[in-house]
C-alpha cells in the first residue's frame, strides 16, 4: 500500500532551468499527484489587471492584455511574502498584494518599433520579466531577440498602459503555471506494455533504459507494478526548479494534513451524534 512505503528520492540533474530526479518505492497515484501539484498548486506572480490608456497598434486591447499576462515574472524573492489579492484588506491594489508595471512606448521613426517585455517598468526590482533578469545597465549588452514580443508599432503609433501583477496558481489560470513542462515516466523499457509500438526497434530509447544496444524493449512482465518514477521538471523562469519541487511537496503535505484534520472532526461529530 502507498502509505506503508518509504519513498526515496535521488536527484540526477539540476540546472537553472530544470531538475531531473527519481522517486522509488511509491505508488502511481502518488506520483501523478505530485506531477499535478507541480503544475497547478505552486503559486507565482503574473500580470492579472491591465488598464490601457492609449493603444493605436494593430492589436486590440484584449490581445495585449492576454500577452502581458503570459510574460513570466521573477517570483523567487517575493511570492511567499505577497498576499493573495482576495485575502488582502486593501480596496484595490497595494504593495502587500500586487506589483505595479507601466509601459509607455511611441514609435517616432520610419523603422518598425518592437514593443517587448523589456519595455515593462516594474516598481519592484524583485519582480521583473524573466528575460530581463540578467540585463546590465548598458542596453547594448542585451540582445532584443531574448525579450518577449508584445506588439509591433509603426511610425505615429503608441502603446501606454498600467498593469498589476498578482499572486496565483495554475489551477486558476495557466499564466500562474510555474513550469514550462513536467514529465515523468515509469516504464523506460516498456516491460509493462503501457505503450504498444508498431515497430519497437524504430522508437528512440529512453535515457533511463537499461537495455542492451540490440534490444528494443524488455520482456513483458504481466505482474509488474510501477514503483520507480523518473521526473523532469522544467521551469518557465519564474521560480528556480528546486523551489518548484519543494513548494509543491509542501503544498501537497498541507493538503493531506488538512484532510486528516477535517476527517477527524467528521468522525468525532458522528460519534457525538450516535451517542
Curated annotation (Swiss-Prot):
GO CC: one term? cytosol
Annotated residues that bind Zn(2+) are located at 88, 90, 94, 97
Phosphoserine: modified positions: 124, 257
* A biological-process GO annotation: transcription by RNA polymerase II
Superkingdom is Eukaryota
What ranges does the record give for the region Disordered, renumbered to this chain? 203-226
Where does the protein end up?
Nucleus
Principal location? nucleus
Name any one GO molecular function: protein dimerization activity
Q: Which SUPFAM superfamilies match?
A: Insert subdomain of RNA polymerase alpha subunit (SSF56553), RBP11-like subunits of RNA polymerase (SSF55257)
Alphabetically sorted, this entry's keywords are: DNA-directed RNA polymerase, Nucleus, Phosphoprotein, Transcription
Q: Which PANTHER family match?
A: DNA-DIRECTED RNA POLYMERASE, DNA-DIRECTED RNA POLYMERASE II SUBUNIT RPB3
Family as reported in the entry's similarity comment: Belongs to the archaeal Rpo3/eukaryotic RPB3 RNA polymerase subunit family.
NCBIfam families according to UniProt: PRK00783.1
The job of this chain, per UniProt, is described as: Core component of RNA polymerase II (Pol II), a DNA-dependent RNA polymerase which synthesizes mRNA precursors and many functional non-coding RNAs using the four ribonucleoside triphosphates as substrates.
Q: How does it assemble?
A: Component of the RNA polymerase II (Pol II) core complex consisting of 12 subunits: a ten-subunit catalytic core composed of POLR2A/RPB1, POLR2B/RPB2, POLR2C/RPB3, POLR2I/RPB9, POLR2J/RPB11, POLR2E/RPABC1, POLR2F/RPABC2, POLR2H/RPABC3, POLR2K/RPABC4 and POLR2L/RPABC5 and a mobile stalk composed of two subunits POLR2D/RPB4 and POLR2G/RPB7, protruding from the core and functioning primarily in transcription initiation. Part of Pol II(G) complex, in which Pol II core associates with an additional subunit POLR2M; unlike conventional Pol II, Pol II(G) functions as a transcriptional repressor.
Q: What is this protein called?
A: DNA-directed RNA polymerase II subunit RPB3
| GN (gene name) | POLR2C
Amino acid at each position: 500500500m502507498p502509505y506503508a512505503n518509504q519513498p526515496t528520492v535521488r536527484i540526477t540533474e539540476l540546472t537553472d532551468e530544470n531538475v531531473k530526479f527519481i522517486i522509488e518505492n511509491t505508488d502511481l497515484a502518488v506520483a501523478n499527484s505530485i506531477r499535478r501539484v507541480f503544475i497547478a498548486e505552486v503559486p507565482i506572480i503574473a500580470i492579472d489587471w491591465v488598464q490601457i490608456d492609449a493603444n493605436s497598434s494593430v492589436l486590440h486591447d484584449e490581445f495585449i492584455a492576454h500577452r502581458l499576462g503570459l510574460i513570466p515574472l521573477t517570483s523567487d524573492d517575493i511570492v511567499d511574502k505577497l498576499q493573495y489579492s482576495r485575502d488582502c484588506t486593501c480596496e484595490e491594489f497595494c504593495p502587500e498584494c500586487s506589483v505595479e508595471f507601466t509601459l509607455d512606448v511611441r514609435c517616432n521613426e520610419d523603422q518598425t518599433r518592437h514593443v517587448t517585455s523589456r519595455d515593462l517598468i516594474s516598481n519592484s526590482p524583485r519582480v521583473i520579466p524573466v528575460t530581463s533578469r540578467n540585463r546590465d545597465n548598458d542596453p547594448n549588452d542585451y540582445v532584443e531577440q531574448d525579450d518577449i514580443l508584445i506588439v509591433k508599432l509603426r511610425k505615429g503609433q503608441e502603446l501606454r498602459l498600467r498593469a498589476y501583477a498578482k499572486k496565483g496558481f495554475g489551477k486558476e489560470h495557466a499564466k500562474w503555471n510555474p513550469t514550462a513542462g513536467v514529465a515523468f515516466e515509469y516504464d523506460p523499457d516498456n516491460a509493462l506494455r503501457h505503450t504498444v509500438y508498431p515497430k519497437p526497434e524504430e522508437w528512440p530509447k529512453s535515457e533511463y533504459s537499461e537495455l542492451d544496444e540490440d534490444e528494443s524493449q524488455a520482456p513483458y512482465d504481466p505482474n509488474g507494478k510501477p514503483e520507480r518514477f523518473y521526473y523532469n521538471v522544467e521551469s518557465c523562469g519564474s521560480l528556480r526548479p528546486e523551489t518548484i519541487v519543494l513548494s509543491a511537496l509542501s503544498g501537497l503535505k498541507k493538503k493531506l494534513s488538512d484532510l486528516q484534520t477535517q476527517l477527524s472532526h467528521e468522525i468525532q461529530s458522528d460519534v457525538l451524534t450516535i451517542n
